[in-house]
Regions:
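Phosphate/pyrophosphate-binding loops at sites that engage ATP/ADP/AMP, CoA/4′-phosphopantetheine
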Residues: 72-85
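Walker A/P-loop NTP-binding active-site region of P-loop NTPases
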Residues: 11
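Active-site-adjacent loop and "lid" segments of alpha/beta metabolic enzymes
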Residues: 1, 5-8, 16, 28-72, ...
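Active-site pocket-lining segment
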Residues: 88-97, 102-105, 216-224
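Haloarchaeal acidic low-complexity proteome signature biased toward cell-envelope/secretome components but also
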Residues: 4, 62-70, 78, 173-244, ...
């Protein structure tokens, strides 16, 4: 027996094992094959049990790694989700093909997984992709893990798997405390402000809500606002930006020095501005190309 609010989880990829464990008073399932067994979600849903779904190739006999972020996202769609599914993008070296850079990109794009509308689990405790950044051994890597834990929670992680429970708890509380406050109100009409900072993050939510992958990219390009400061502009370049802004709804705030300005708009706005102001000067073309490339 244990004290406190411990939750007992059975790690299995087979629905028969999950059913037996849940019927024997286990609380949840950890499926490292990501519902490769198509009956797993049915078993968990029928028992109203939470299930952690780890991204994996769709092979029940050979769990493995999925390398690219887009492929991880698709793997987590396999055989659907239950109301109590927790998605796990699966950090770590499950195969030789998966590199530290793959894990770093997944961590960098962690907010995208909020597009499922489900809780996110991260297993990042002393992982290689973090230790390598700081040049630390496994024994020395606790501070590295704690820093990443705060960042993961701020980016949307709800569950953190760890071997350093007390310290990780504190790091998670700091991440939660200083996460950006968003609107969330329940009523006759519920309102929730989504945590969206990039076009790719917006596209995940648009795709979930509309079910139209073809339309999601265009809609997502209107979802975030970026602010850039341009300096060293001449009068002709500023005039071209003013003219383009009247067509694209780009907001310009001109500096008092006569050569700088702030440009405020969505990725779609900046894309239209780059087209409308094209050809005035190679310097302005290059600056606008850097902006549009960063907002794609």
């Amino acid at each position: 027996s244990v004290s406190g609010d411990a939750v007992f989880s059975i790690e299995t990829r087979y629905h028969e094992v999950a059913a037996a464990a849940l019927d024997a008073n286990f609380d949840m399932v950890n499926d490292i094959c990501g519902f490769a067994d198509p009956k797993m979600p049915e078993v968990c849903d029928a028992r109203d049990a939470a299930v952690a779904k780890m991204a994996s190739p769709p092979d029940l006999e050979r769990p493995g790694a999925v390398e690219e972020v887009d492929d991880i996202y698709e793997a987590l769609k396999l055989n659907g989700l239950t109301d109590k599914t927790i998605v796990d993008p699966a950090f770590g070296g499950w195969s030789e093909a998966k590199t530290l850079e793959h894990d770093r990109e997944t961590f960098d794009r962690l907010r995208e997984f909020r597009g499922f509308g489900q809780p996110i689990l991260v297993s990042i405790n002393r992982k290689n992709f973090l230790r390598d950044v700081a040049g630390r051994s496994t024994e020395e890597a606790l501070p590295v893990s704690l820093a990443a834990t705060s960042m993961a929670v701020e980016r949307g992680a709800h569950v953190v798997r760890t071997h350093d429970v007390a310290e990780t708890r504190d790091a998670a509380l700091i991440g939660a405390e200083f996460a950006r406050r968003r609107v969330r109100e329940e009523g006759d009409v519920d309102v929730e402000e989504l945590d969206v900072t990039t076009v790719r993050e917006a596209r995940r939510h648009v795709d979930r809500v509309s079910g139209d992958g073809d339309a999601s990219t265009d809609a997502a390009r209107h979802a975030t606002t970026r602010v850039f400061e341009l300096t060293g502009l001449n009068d002709e370049e500023k005039g071209a930006l003013r003219a383009a802004a009247t067509e694209t709804a780009l907001v310009l705030v001109e500096g008092t020095d006569g050569t700088s300005l702030l440009a405020i708009g969505t990725p779609a706005t900046f894309g239209g501005t780059a087209t409308a102001a094209s050809g005035v000067s190679s310097a302005l073309d290059a600056a606008l190309e850097r902006i549009t490339a960063s907002t794609r």
